[in-house]
Amino acid sequence: MDIPKHSRRQFIQLASALGAGAMLPRLSEGAHHASISNPLAGRLYKTLKFKMIKIEGSLTDKFKAAKAAGFMGVEMNSPGMDIRETRKAMRESGLPVDGTVGSTHWKIRHTSPDKETRAEALKLLKQALRDTHAVGGHTCLLVVGKGEDGAADEIDKRSIENISQAVPLAAELGVAIVVENVWNQMHYDHDGDSNQTADQLAHYVDEFNSPWVGMQLDIGNHWKYGSMGDWIRTLGKRVIKLDVKGFSRALNDWAAIGEGDIDFADVRKALHEINYHGWVAAEVKGGDLDALKTISKQMDRAFGL
């Protein structure tokens, strides 16, 4: 009997969260009790973008700083990651790489009208998948393109056809391609109001018809355009991973995590409703060890960890 697609995607979500389990600390008894009052406690694993770790020293030193700040993983950039040095940093720090972020996807796009550019985008995506697998990661974050590359139906068709060619490799390696919702004028109205839904994103992901393509939903990026709790409910099991930052509709500007006016109470409720277990990645300015500790605590407060 075939396993439903969303069940397979949920398995990937859990594998992403627990695949580096040997390197993750055991939950304390306190965390167990905390989960009684807050169902997300013990179910979210904090990670951060590598570029946020702004301290001097080796890659190992940077990993150790992230761990000391309270993070349980690091997202590296790929292509461009030094596999050997990253493995060394993981080994010496005890901190896993849970996934990667595409380093070229804004410039070399799957939506490009130029066939050679799309071919290069595919080549780089496959390299990122291989790099991610080489360091034990389970997700490869992808910005699929830009709305400026053509009409909505054209760029959707181009990007889906192009990215789909990498899906067999993603399945072979056990690395999910996770689409991030960004301000790229795709699947939302950039000049629209705050009552927009995630329906277009859900449809886009479903067009791949694969559990190996899902969402890395950025909770801050589209608060300007819609209810993040409702977006989470709409996307459901398509959400393999989360990004987080703050945003203020009142000021129309970014904010620290938990500041601004994002309805985190509804976000927490929605994550519980879809039974989300997995990684949540900070995507903010970052800084030295003290700054990273502050960000980690902000995430704890926002998600009730």
Where are these regions (language model features)?
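N-terminal substrate-binding region of glycoside hydrolase catalytic domains
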Residues: 65, 69-78, 104-105
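Active-site acidic/histidine proton-transfer and metal-coordination neighborhood
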Residues: 10, 14-24, 38-40, 111-217, ...
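Metal-dependent catalytic neighborhoods of phosphoester/phosphodiester hydrolases
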Residues: 83-87, 152, 291-292
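Glycine-rich, proline-tolerant flexible connector loops at the mouths of alpha/beta enzymes
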Residues: 77-92
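Active-site-proximal loop/turn and secondary-structure-junction residues that shape catalytic pockets
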Residues: 52-54, 80-82, 103-106, 146-148, ...
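Anion (oxyanion) recognition and catalysis
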Residues: 67, 91, 133, 171, ...
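Histidine-acidic metal/acid-base catalytic patches
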Residues: 2-47, 52, 56-70, 136-138, ...
